[in-house]
Amino acid sequence: MDAPGDAVGDAVGDGASRAEARPARRGRRWNRSLWVGLRPYGIGSGTVKPNHFKDMARIAWQHRRHPVYAWRVLSRGVCDGCALGVAGFHDWTIDGVHLCTTRLELLSVNTADELDPAGMADAAALRSRTNRELRALGRLAHPMRRRAGERGFSRVSWDDALAEVADGIRRAGGERTALYLTSRGITNEVYYVAGKAARAMGVASVDSAARVCHAPSTVALREAIGAAATTCSLQDVLEADLVVLIGSNPANNQPVFMKHLYEAKRGGTKVAVVNPYLEPGLVAYWVPSSPESALFGTKICDLHVPVRPGGDVAFLHAVLKVLVERDLVDMDFVGAHTAGWEELAADLAGRDLADLARTAGLAVAEVEAFA
């Protein structure tokens, strides 16, 4: 068992009730016990990822030509990278400053210079460019059209472009028209307006990158819990006694979540990571929008459970078996919100805890410490 596990493992010893195991909630003040060290943002440690301060300096340099406009977009605009209802430097989900590297990286989408129309004259040359190279060409400021057989794109007026698109939709009809939205930096507001416009035109088929990104999770959630969406909110994280991250690395993939995890840690929440590898960003993290965390860092992981790749299901079965045998299952909740409990309990009763732990790549003691 990794060293971070001692705090949680000791707190939930044999026979401890849920109430006894619950961490004490604290006021969200600065807490030295969570500090990583006295290096602002871990400068010089060589293990910090992502390095927000370096990214901020790089992005500021990229926008040196029009800093005033870039500042207006940040201070008055919405976030292109999340759905927290961001208005300027604040959002509707959590107090404090809202600023993440995802939003900064997408800033260039909103502040790009107009591209040179001459660069659109050769479609074959455009095909040879990468996505990054195409974005570097700049912002498409005017409608461009390429007809079949033409070498490249040529500029047309807004009236001609809108009339041609409208005529195509009118001739096809709403039943034979689909709207697909996917682009780097499309905001919630754009999705909302596009959906309203599609309905006004009688178009029922609206799809977006959200479905492509989350299709696997929606299928799995529907099969597992009967609902295709998550059953908790970010607000729930702030009030949770224990947050379990299974096969997830939010420090790299969902950095906005780390601010909520930091606030939860200040309130006494424990964090367990179930993953073969303990990501550096889950050992220690520096939240750039929080003075305390930016200066001293925040210890995130309290317990690391190094399951074998593919051993997640066996691990969860083993944990559930321990909870059942120790009478730590909230049967009132289970009875009100689940189906098939009796069959699951009977199946677990016939399984050997040591075999389950072995399949998960763990010792029985590690499973018991987590449970």
Kindly give the residue locations of the regions a language model identified:
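Cofactor-pocket helix-loop regions in the catalytic cores of large enzyme subunits
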Residues: 20-50, 138-371
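Metallocofactor- and cofactor-centric catalytic cores in central/energy metabolism, strongly enriched
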Residues: 78-171, 285, 363, 369-370
